[in-house]
Curated annotation (Swiss-Prot):
Coiled coil (UniProt feature): none
Annotated keywords: Cytoplasm, Protein biosynthesis
Disulfide links within the chain: none
Organism: Chlamydia pneumoniae (Chlamydophila pneumoniae)
Function: Responsible for the release of ribosomes from messenger RNA at the termination of protein biosynthesis. May increase the efficiency of translation by recycling ribosomes from one round of translation to another.
GO molecular function, one term: ribosomal large subunit binding
Pfam families: RRF
Lineage: Bacteria, Pseudomonadati, Chlamydiota, Chlamydiia, Chlamydiales
UniProt protein name: Ribosome-recycling factor
């Protein structure tokens, strides 16, 4: 695999990771991503909620969690509370309902700050990938200086492309948070 392909793959992975992180931001709308990564103690081990239950959206502000094993309902509720997501699960038999509260203005501002911080962290990650790729190119003695410079330019174009995508994702999520 060439340095360019490897670099693009790593940058795409960084973008994908940021996208997954952003999906878990609470916007006031019910979304399965809010709780699917919650860790629950069941069967003597810890498991992700998405592995032991189905999560669906009942309406705009309510999630319904249906455990595959009904006996795990209380453990799931405890896991959600322990995750400190500011969500209050209600156990109804073997089903858990979660009403997603409407975020306050202060909470929205804090979420936007966190979002921007995560975006900057992702950009730093992309720039670090660029630096590593450029270092690899410079260390490769088989390449001529012109080839190295050309590849560095292509790597910079990749970096710009992925940073722009990160900014666009951030703007979309900011608009979503602000429009609540």
């Amino acid at each position: 695999m060439s340095v360019l392909q490897d670099t693009e793959k790593k940058m795409a992975a960084a973008l994908d990771f940021f996208h997954k992180e952003v999906k878990s931001f609470r916007t006031g709308k019910a979304h399965p991503a809010l709780v699917e990564t919650v860790v629950v103690d069941v069967y003597g081990t810890t498991m992700r909620l998405s592995d032991i239950a189905s999560i669906s959206v009942a309406d705009l502000r309510q999630l319904v969690i249906s455990p595959y094993d009904g006996n795990n309902a209380s453990a799931i509720a405890k896991g959600i509370i322990a995750a400190n997501l500011n969500l209050q699960p209600e156990v109804e038999g073997s089903i858990i309902r979660i009403k997603v509260p409407e975020p306050t203005a202060d909470y929205r501002q804090e979420m936007i700050k966190q979002l921007r911080r995560k975006c900057e962290e992702a950009k730093i990650n992309v720039r670090n990938i660029r630096r590593e790729a450029n270092d690899k190119l410079k260390k490769d003695s088989a390449l001529t200086e012109d080839v190295v410079k050309g590849n560095e330019k292509k790597i910079q174009e990749l970096t710009d492309k992925f940073c722009k995508q990160l900014d666009e994702l951030t703007k979309q999520k900011e608009a979503e948070i602000a429009s609540i």
